């Protein structure tokens, strides 16, 4: 850091997670720009819906390399690794403004997806590094608000840029915001043991709240070892089943509103952001439910599982999106889907920091994220290949059912930790 006087900040960890949340906001704003601009881009360049599914598929292929991002973050360290990825996604996003065909978009979306795949493991590594165990659920929720806020801001901001200038300017504008955040990150972030603004009391509080069984082992994380663990698949498979909801809200709902509901660009700007407002609330609702149950004696793991189950139950409302006549009812059901998805998603994501060592968290988050993005990829390709024949309704039905299966897997694959009981001590005095 420059030789300046930095004041001590109380609760510095919340400033840090706020900084990471801001990065996530910009991350999801840039990735959502394509979905919002899609009706205009497809019309301007003559791109078909099937070709658009390949463009979104390229993004998912890139982001499926998230385990590489996680490994880089665990190896290089959070500050350096996240800075490299932030610079890469910002430049890739701005380059979208130069694309002239679907192939060019596909290449750039793949690069963007790879770089932006760093956000989730970086967020989870921040949570694991900076927060005691009892605060991680809420901290993870705060970080994941960034995904919802970024996606929420995309419709009005991108439509404004398109109508004021053109769709190319929209990509340049959102990408440039990432470079601004990068400067803030490099200036302000340091690890807890090196940050000049951290008080000794907070440093001790963070250290005291770490579980000893999750302490760093000192060796690089082993991907093979992680993949062999049942608890990893208890996180990864629910991600595979849940993440298609987010991909649909981000990349396909604007087209659905345009092609099926007859919305114009201004109407998309008015309504397409609402599911992400609801998702913001879900980011906080899931950890709140888990915390409420913990306060009443439910174990940490079981509290998380019940929060996921509640979210999965609410997701069944998505079944009716395509079956209601009123566009307002459809938007309301999409909002319920956004709320329910983030209720369960943020909870599942946070479990990586509950179940694995701190030096494994980013790698685990990256591997689980790869599974989630594989689910989004396959689901997007199915939509692109079949929507012209069967419409959107069957896909909304599938989204309403998949998370129920994910909740069952979570309960089946992840076992609650049983604390060892102390040896009984006789109450009868020795003679």
Where are these regions (language model features)?
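Extracytoplasmic gate region of multi-pass secondary transporters
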Residues: 34-35, 229-284, 344-345, 349
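Extracellular/periplasmic helix-loop-helix junction of adjacent transmembrane segments
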Residues: 35-66
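Helix-breaking motifs and short loop linkers at transmembrane-helix boundaries and internal kinks
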Residues: 46, 77, 98-104, 115, ...
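Central cavity-lining transmembrane alpha-helices of secondary-active solute carriers
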Residues: 57-71, 273-286
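Conserved MFS/SLC helix-loop-helix module at the cytosolic interface between two early adjacent transmembrane helices
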Residues: 65-103
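C-terminal ends and interior cores of transmembrane alpha-helices
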Residues: 87-100, 310-325
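Cytoplasmic helix-loop-helix junction between adjacent transmembrane helices
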Residues: 108-147
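Helix-loop-helix hairpin linking two adjacent transmembrane segments in secondary transporters
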Residues: 143-196
């Amino acid at each position: 850091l420059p030789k300046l006087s930095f004041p001590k900040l109380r609760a510095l960890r919340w400033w840090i997670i706020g900084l990471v949340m801001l990065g996530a906001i910009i991350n999801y704003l840039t990735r959502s720009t394509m979905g919002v601009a899609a009706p205009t881009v497809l019309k301007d360049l003559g791109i078909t819906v099937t070709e658009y599914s390949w463009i979104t598929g390229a993004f998912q292929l890139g982001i499926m390399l998230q385990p590489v991002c996680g490994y880089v973050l665990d190896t290089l360290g959070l500050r350096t690794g996240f800075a490299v990825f932030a610079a890469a996604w910002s430049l890739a996003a701005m380059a979208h403004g130069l694309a002239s065909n679907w192939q060019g978009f596909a290449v750039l979306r793949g690069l963007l997806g790879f770089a932006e795949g760093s956000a989730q493991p970086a967020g989870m590594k921040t949570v694991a590094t900076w927060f005691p165990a009892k605060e991680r659920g809420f901290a993870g929720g705060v970080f994941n608000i960034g995904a919802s806020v970024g996606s929420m801001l995309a419709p009005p901001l991108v439509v404004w840029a398109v109508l004021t200038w053109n769709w190319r300017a929209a990509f340049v504008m959102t990408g440039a915001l990432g470079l601004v955040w990068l400067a803030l990150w490099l200036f302000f972030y340091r690890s807890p043991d090196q940050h000049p603004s951290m008080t000794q009391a907070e440093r001790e509080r963070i250290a005291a709240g770490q579980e000893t069984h999750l302490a760093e082992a000192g060796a690089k994380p082993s991907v093979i070892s992680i993949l062999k663990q049942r608890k990893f698949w208890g996180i990864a498979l629910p991600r595979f089943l849940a993440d298609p909801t987010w991909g649909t809200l981000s990349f396909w709902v604007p087209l659905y509103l345009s092609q099926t509901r007859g919305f114009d660009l201004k109407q998309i700007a008015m309504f397409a952001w609402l599911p992400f407002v609801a998702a913001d609330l879900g980011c906080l609702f899931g950890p709140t439910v888990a915390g409420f149950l913990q306060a009443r004696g439910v174990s940490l793991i079981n509290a998380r599982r019940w929060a996921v189950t509640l979210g999965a139950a609410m997701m069944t409302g998505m079944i009716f999106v395509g079956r209601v006549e009123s566009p307002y009812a459809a938007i309301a059901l999409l909002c319920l889907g956004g709320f329910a998805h983030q209720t369960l998603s943020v909870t599942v994501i946070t479990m990586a920091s509950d179940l694995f060592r701190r030096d494994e968290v980013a790698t685990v988050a990256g591997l689980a994220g790869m599974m989630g993005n594989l689910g989004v990829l396959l689901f997007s390709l199915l939509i692109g290949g079949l929507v012209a024949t069967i419409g959107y309704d069957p896909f909304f039905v599938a989204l309403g059912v998949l998370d129920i299966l994910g909740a069952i897997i979570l309960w089946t694959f992840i076992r609650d930790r049983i604390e060892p009981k102390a040896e009984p001590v006789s109450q009868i005095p020795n003679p």
